[in-house]
Every structure is written in structure tokens, then in C-alpha cells.
């Protein structure tokens, strides 16, 4: 006659905590296993993602109002008229690199209002 799972559970329920601990230790010895919880490592997926602190403002197209875009580029970079015009015509091009998020957002807004297409990377 074999013992059912329900009978085993009833036997566990009737045991004291010390008796359960002794039973677990005996099972570990008999079967050569450990009852310790397995530690799962997250690997690369669980690595802390570092928040980006420096951004590049990239002009992707100067749009229809090229003059306003050139003025915005000059104001933001301090370039001369010729250099700012060349930059606007060389799109896609980084207008400013390594700037803070706030500065990048402000420059994007300024260039977008002038009619340019801008990305922050």
C-alpha cells in the first residue's frame, strides 16, 4: 500500500517546525540536494541603464524657411553666415554636440519654429 500526496501533506501539517527542519535536512542528505533558494542572475538585461546626460542636436532638413533656420543656427553656434548656410545645406548634420537635455530641447524648439526638421540623439 502506497502513501498518497494528501497523507504526506497531513503528516507535514501535524509536525512541529523543528521536525520539518530535521526532515528537510534528512532529505538533503539522502538525495544530495540543497533546499536553498536558487539565485537567478539577470545578466545583461537586468543591468542598470545609465541615463544619457549629453545629447546631440541634429538638423535633418532646413525646410522652406532657409533664412530663419540659418539665423537660428548662427545664434546657437556663433558661426558666421557662410558657415551657418553651409551647415544648413549639409543636412543631416549635428548643429551642437554634447549639450544638456534642456539646452538640446531649447535648440530643437528654436530650429523647429524656424521651419527646420530636427532630431535629438
Curated annotation (Swiss-Prot):
Assigned GO CC terms: cytosolic large ribosomal subunit
GO biological processes: translation
Keyword Membrane part of the UniProt annotation = no
What is the species of this protein?
Answer: Shewanella baltica (strain OS185)
Q: Which HAMAP family match?
A: Ribosomal_bL12
NCBIfam families given in the database record: L12
Record-stated family? Belongs to the bacterial ribosomal protein bL12 family.
Classify the source by domain of life.
Bacteria
Task: Please provide, alphabetically and separated by semicolons, the GO molecular function terms listed in this UniProt record.
Answer: mRNA binding; structural constituent of ribosome
Matches recorded under InterPro entries: Ribosomal_bL12 (IPR000206), Ribosomal_bL12_C (IPR013823), Ribosomal_bL12_C/ClpS-like (IPR014719), Ribosomal_bL12_oligo (IPR008932), Ribosomal_bL12_oligo_N_sf (IPR036235)
Q: Does the keyword RNA-binding apply?
A: no
Q: Which Pfam families match?
A: Ribosomal_L12, Ribosomal_L12_N
Q: How does it assemble?
A: Homodimer. Part of the ribosomal stalk of the 50S ribosomal subunit. Forms a multimeric L10(L12)X complex, where L10 forms an elongated spine to which 2 to 4 L12 dimers bind in a sequential fashion. Binds GTP-bound translation factors.
Q: Which UniProt keyword terms apply here? A: Ribonucleoprotein, Ribosomal protein
Identification of the protein by name:
Large ribosomal subunit protein bL12
Function recorded in the entry: Forms part of the ribosomal stalk which helps the ribosome interact with GTP-bound translation factors. Is thus essential for accurate translation.
Amino acid at each position: 500500500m502506497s502513501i498518497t500526496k494528501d497523507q504526506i501533506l497531513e503528516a507535514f501539517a501535524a509536525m512541529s517546525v523543528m521536525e520539518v527542519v530535521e526532515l528537510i535536512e534528512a532529505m538533503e542528505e539522502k538525495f544530495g540536494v540543497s533546499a536553498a533558494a536558487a539565485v537567478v542572475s539577470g545578466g545583461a538585461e537586468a543591468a542598470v541603464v545609465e541615463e544619457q546626460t549629453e545629447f546631440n542636436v541634429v538638423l535633418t532638413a532646413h525646410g522652406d524657411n532657409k533664412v530663419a533656420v540659418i539665423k537660428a543656427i548662427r545664434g546657437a553656434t556663433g558661426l558666421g553666415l557662410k558657415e551657418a548656410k553651409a551647415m544648413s545645406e549639409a543636412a543631416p548634420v549635428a548643429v551642437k554636440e554634447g549639450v544638456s537635455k534642456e539646452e538640446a530641447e531649447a535648440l530643437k524648439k528654436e530650429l523647429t519654429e524656424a521651419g527646420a526638421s530636427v532630431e535629438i540623439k
